[in-house]
């Protein structure tokens, strides 16, 4: 079998090296890197051989190729759960450099001789007391981090450190005074948290007050133990200047309070219970917050050092918190936690996740210049601001720039309120956020809208973070940079207990920087005035006058109860019902819309503080995508003969009030010119209110610049009349009024004609009890589509425009022509199914086109495919009617709950012929049937008479709409390939192009000649199996040979062809030699030897040469004179005869006489070697 060397890709004959599943020549098995011979040891990398030196070298991309650095000793952090149960092993912090105490801005001037002015209380843990009267800046406070400094290198001298630590903090096991000699220096701002009971555990935590002002309290007598009380009580009436001090809060586990623990509920004016007998330092405050039923979190026994003296982290912040706490606070957001206890300088540590999450609060501490002129020095500690303390409310106004939330009586101290981190660089320096602001409040279902969801504000004037963001007043509860719009950073504010004040929800909508706010009535309702939306979702067939509940409410209406609201609602319903009946008798039609869902409100406020300043509005646009679904709305379409000159002025000044809408549809606002625009569908409510105030719709001037168009139907002989001269039909004259309004645009006066908005609501959703509604989408310029009207035959109806501006009645998503601003509003309409069918078959192959002449552009609407019902109806009415010239419109309304409305689309193109519409609409007979009952439908059927057909035939070809240019046809070039005239051996198909011929002269497609094992196309040399004629690629051949190796070893190989024997082969075995039957041949004539007629010449122990007897006796081969065997290899010629090299021997000693060795021929004519001759001659001489 053939083997291929992996390295040189040549055939391996003889000895091979088989490694990694590949064969190698002995000289080809070398190192891949250095090409050295691998005779003894080799190493494998990715099935490639390497020598030992190259194997140990680092290689690119090797994951083990990592530079080994010298390990340095370091302190390994220890988990808090592994800390000692008691303080036998206290932390020995490392010393820090000099800590400057120049931040102490206020000092206490004590006039007593016994006062000890310790401006720099740099106490050392190794000293029991520190009564220093000078500035000892070199003996600096150690810089230690309780979260990372626990290590084996720091746990030394545990007993002495424990004693020194307790004595320096004024904690003694057997009682006594706190800090020694009344100095009260101790370790400032070092806090211990202990579990009261048998298993005590204390964790030292450092409270940071970096770069803040501290009080230098000078204790002058033993009465100082009772003077350092917590200023969270009502005992402190000092009006103090707020100073920024940081404190930290970590979540704590649930621990029940033990007996004897010192408790300060943060509400009662509890005096410090620590005196000279309690072992608590006299300048510290003790806290243990009461558990809350909601959060069930209890503060453990806490000893908090006052802010007196040096802070261990004043000079430099520890590594776990970064370089500076100010940088951390400015980049962090407070995450509200319901189970976090609030108190003054309290750490709550959660045992299951130690040190997982730290909340840093910036407290406003108070610092005073206290002039103590008596022996009893009243040291006023920093007033640690308590957010939940109701009794400290008088100081809250002066101690905080932002008014903190009042959660009611201080009953639940463990409930956390969403409090933002406010940073003030100076005292009483209120933060001024940037101007741009956007507020978006959700009103899905009946959830209360909360200002914490999304609130950006301007010009922070309010001190209450619980107040909502009011765009008009520029109030905000959190600082924001200019033009910042990150809606994901804010989370909903959780409800804080029963005593939490109800959140005032405000939704604002602005178009010209003018806003109105609508407060929320209670938690059960959405925005006030939207109580009817739930009724709309449940009863879609309620009376259309229910939508009048969307009237505008100011902030005073939030206090109305439900009965008042229902009473007013019924009164409005009766009033609107009377007005509707009156208007219906006058021929005015009220079309009703009903859509429902849940939603959101969008508020956009420009950078313009002055609404009259239009220059800033060009800076950039805003693109918002907000889901909307609108509640029930009534759009009153009315006729207005003349435009009011002040309509545009009122449109620019209109104020839109959005009372909160439900999500369910998409609103996309794009404004390339930079003008902020809000698409407010609720503006239609203002139109309704103004419309009902005017009984006569023809004399009504809508403040939203309503465009009204009159369509009167006149005699069929008259063509489509001029807008200024409508014709009335003598037989049946009917006027159909449509009032079209342009909702919500914020347009600059000089750009008002170019920047116009349009809103298309399609399909109409109405119940059988409602009037059918057509809402019209129009932008400058406008176009009108008659396809919305359904016509019945034998009725004369003509359309006349009263204004040059026309309206396009198209049930499409939104169609703007030549409008720089496009606004697309799509609605998911529930509880309704509205189907529109428009068919416009024409007289010829071209569809009937209805065109309206207008001053700017011409828009034509085309409808296709007449139904069978229309054809039958027309045939029944007039036998001579040509079906191609008829037009059928049908509006089908179905109240199918749970189905979405089916949308129909119309085809619009522009024509240049102004007379086409007049010619097309000549002698058309129309009729309007208005049903004011449960179902209102418009059925318009165009009935054509013979005169109309003649006029239609006289229409010139030039008046037809321009045909679209023919599409360019691209053809693919096909190249014909001549057939080879042969078929593929595999697929039996004719071969075109390249042809592959194998060793048997068989033809294949190149893609059909594949390996029988891996089925890959063979382009390289291949191998065959003779028994089955299968084709194998080189790789598969090697694999198959390796798999068959054990079997080949058992059968052996042929000594002639060196191929392995198989079970199917006929084998000839001679001694140890095996041959194929066809391989056992004569070496002279190369014929297969049959039977035993052969002569053998053995070359080695495993190979021999054979010759048939025919060649042997014919003289074609030499015969040995000694053995009479055939000579096929090397022979020796001596004494005229041929000998095998091994057969020419000495006749005396029988030693082989080699080539070129002297010998002698004796008398018997046999060879004698030289040694035998010499021996015989010596013996003869001795005789």
Swiss-Prot record:
Region annotated Disordered, chain positions: 56-192, 207-242, 255-294, 364-412, 426-445, 450-622, 632-651, 690-807, 829-848, 857-957
InterPro entries, A to Z: Znf_LIM (IPR001781)
SMART domains listed in its UniProt record: LIM
Membrane-spanning segments: none
Segments of skewed composition (Basic residues): 567-591, 703-739, 769-779, 829-841, 925-945
Entry keywords, A to Z: LIM domain, Metal-binding, Repeat, Zinc
Signal sequence residues: none
Protein known as: LIM domain-containing protein A
Organism, scientific name: Dictyostelium discoideum
């Amino acid at each position: 079998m053939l083997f291929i060397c992996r390295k040189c890709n040549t055939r391996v004959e003889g000895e091979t090296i088989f490694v990694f599943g590949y064969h190698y020549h002995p000289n080809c098995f070398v190192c891949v890197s250095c090409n050295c011979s691998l005779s003894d040891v080799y190493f494998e990398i990715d099935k490639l051989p390497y020598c030992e030196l190259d194997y140990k070298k680092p290689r690119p991309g090797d994951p083990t190729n990592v530079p080994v650095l010298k390990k340095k000793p370091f302190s390994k952090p220890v988990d808090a759960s592994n800390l000692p149960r008691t303080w036998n092993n206290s932390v020995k912090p490392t010393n820090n450099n000099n800590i400057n105490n120049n931040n102490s801005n206020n000092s206490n001037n004590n006039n007593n001789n016994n006062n000890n002015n310790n401006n720099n209380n740099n106490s050392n843990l190794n000293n029991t007391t520190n009564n220093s009267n000078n500035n000892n800046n070199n003996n600096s406070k150690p810089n230690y981090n309780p979260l990372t400094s626990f290590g084996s290198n720091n746990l030394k001298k545990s007993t002495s450190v424990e004693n020194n630590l307790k004595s320096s903090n004024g904690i003694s096991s057997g009682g006594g005074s706190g800090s020694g000699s009344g100095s009260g220096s101790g370790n400032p701002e070092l806090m211990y948290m202990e579990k009261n009971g048998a298993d005590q555990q204390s964790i030292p935590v450092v409270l940071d007050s970096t770069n803040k002002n501290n009080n230098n309290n000078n204790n002058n007598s033993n009465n100082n133990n009772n003077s350092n009380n917590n200023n969270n009580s009502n005992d402190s009436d000092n009006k103090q200047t707020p100073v920024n001090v940081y404190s930290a809060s970590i979540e704590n586990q649930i621990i029940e309070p033990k007996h004897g623990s010192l408790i300060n509920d943060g509400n009662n004016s509890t005096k410090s219970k620590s005196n000279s007998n309690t072992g608590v330092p006299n300048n510290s405050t003790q806290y243990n917050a009461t558990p809350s039923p909601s959060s069930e979190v209890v503060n453990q026994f806490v000893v908090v050092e006052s802010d007196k003296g040096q802070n261990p982290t004043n000079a430099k912040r520890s590594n776990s918190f970064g370089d500076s706490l100010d940088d951390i606070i400015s980049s962090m957001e407070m995450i509200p936690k319901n189970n976090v206890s609030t108190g003054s300088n309290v750490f709550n540590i959660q045992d299951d996740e130690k040190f997982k999450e730290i909340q840093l609060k910036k407290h406003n501490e108070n610092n005073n210049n206290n002039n103590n002129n008596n022996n009893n020095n009243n040291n006023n500690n920093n007033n640690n601001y308590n957010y939940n303390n109701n009794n400290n409310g008088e100081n809250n106004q002066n101690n905080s720039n932002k008014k903190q939330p009042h959660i009611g009586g201080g009953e639940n101290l463990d409930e956390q309120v969403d409090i933002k981190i406010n940073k003030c660089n100076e005292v009483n320096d209120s933060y001024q956020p940037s101007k741009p602001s956007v507020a978006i409040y959700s009103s899905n279902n009946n959830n209360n809208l909360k200002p914490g969801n999304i609130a950006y504000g301007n010009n922070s004037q309010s001190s209450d973070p619980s107040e909502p963001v009011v765009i008009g007043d520029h109030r905000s509860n959190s600082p924001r940079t200019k033009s910042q719009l990150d809606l994901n950073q804010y989370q909903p504010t959780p409800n804080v207990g029963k005593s939490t004040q109800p959140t005032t929800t405000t939704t604002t909508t602005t178009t010209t920087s003018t806003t109105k706010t609508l407060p929320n009535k209670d938690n059960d309702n959405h925005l006030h005035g939207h109580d009817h939306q739930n009724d709309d979702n449940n009863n879609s067939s309620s009376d259309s006058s229910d939508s009048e509940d969307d009237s505008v409410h100011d902030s005073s209406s939030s206090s109305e109860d439900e009965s008042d609201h229902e009473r007013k609602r019924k009164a409005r319903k009766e009033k609107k019902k009377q007005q509707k009946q009156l208007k219906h008798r006058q021929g005015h039609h009220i079309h009703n819309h009903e859509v429902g869902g849940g939603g959101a409100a969008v508020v956009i406020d420009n950078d313009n503080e002055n609404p009259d300043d239009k220059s800033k509005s060009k800076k950039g646009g805003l693109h918002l995508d907000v889901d909307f679904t609108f509640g029930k709305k009534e759009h009153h379409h009315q006729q207005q003969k003349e435009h009011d000159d002040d309509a545009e002025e009122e449109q620019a000044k209109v104020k839109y009030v959005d009372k909160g809408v439900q999500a369910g549809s998409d609103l996309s606002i794009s404004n390339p010119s930079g003008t902020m625009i809000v698409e407010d569908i609720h503006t239609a409510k203002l139109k309704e209110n103004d419309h009902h105030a005017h009984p006569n719709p023809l004399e009504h001037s809508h403040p939203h610049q309503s465009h009204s168009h009159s369509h009167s139907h006149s005699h069929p002989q008259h063509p489509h009349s001029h807008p200024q001269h409508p014709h009335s039909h003598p037989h049946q004259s009917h006027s159909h009024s449509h009032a079209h309004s342009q909702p919500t645009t914020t347009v600059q006066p000089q750009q008002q004609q170019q920047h116009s908005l349009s809103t298309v609501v399609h399909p109409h959703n109405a119940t059988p009890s409602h009037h059918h509604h057509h809402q019209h989408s129009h932008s400058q310029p406008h176009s009108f589509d008659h396809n919305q009207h359904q016509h019945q035959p034998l009725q004369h109806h003509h359309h006349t425009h009263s204004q040059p501006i026309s309206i396009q009645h198209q049930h499409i998503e939104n169609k703007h022509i030549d409008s720089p601003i496009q606004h697309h509003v799509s609605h998911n309409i529930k509880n309704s199914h509205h189907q529109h069918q428009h068919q416009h078959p024409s007289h010829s192959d071209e569809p009937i086109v209805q065109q309206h002449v207008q001053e700017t552009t011409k828009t034509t609407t085309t409808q296709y495919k007449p139904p069978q019902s229309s054809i039958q109806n027309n045939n029944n009415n007039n036998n001579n009617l040509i079906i191609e010239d008829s037009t059928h419109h049908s509006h089908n309304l179905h109240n199918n709950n749970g189905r979405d409305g089916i949308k129909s689309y119309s085809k619009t193109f522009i024509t240049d012929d102004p007379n086409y519409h007049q010619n097309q609409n000549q002698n058309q007979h129309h009729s309007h049937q208005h049903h004011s009952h449960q179902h209102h439908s418009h059925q318009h059927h165009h009935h054509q008479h013979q005169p109309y057909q003649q006029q239609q035939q006289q229409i010139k070809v030039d008046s037809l709409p321009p045909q679209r240019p023919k599409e360019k046809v691209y053809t693919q070039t096909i190249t014909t390939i001549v057939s080879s005239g042969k078929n593929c051996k595999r697929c039996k198909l004719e071969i075109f192009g390249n042809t592959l011929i194998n060793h048997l002269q068989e033809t294949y497609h190149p893609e059909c000649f594949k390996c029988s094992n891996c089925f890959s196309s063979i382009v390289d040399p291949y191998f065959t199996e003779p028994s089955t004629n299968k084709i194998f690629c080189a790789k598969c051949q090697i694999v198959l040979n390796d798999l068959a190796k054990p079997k080949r070893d058992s059968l052996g190989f042929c000594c002639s062809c060196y191929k392995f024997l198989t079970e199917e082969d006929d084998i000839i075995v001679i001694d140890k030699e095996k041959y194929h039957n066809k391989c056992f041949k004569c070496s002279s004539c190369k014929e297969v030897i049959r039977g035993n007629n052969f002569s053998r010449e053995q070359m080695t122990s495993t190979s021999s040469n054979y010759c048939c007897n025919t060649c042997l006796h014919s003289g074609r081969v030499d015969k040995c004179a000694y053995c009479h065997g055939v000579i096929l290899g090397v022979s020796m010629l001596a004494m005229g005869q041929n000998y095998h090299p091994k057969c020419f021997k000495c006749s005396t000693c029988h030693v082989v006489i080699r080539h070129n060795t002297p010998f002698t021929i004796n008398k018997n004519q046999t060879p004698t070697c030289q040694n035998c001759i010499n021996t015989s001659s010596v013996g003869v001489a001795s005789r």
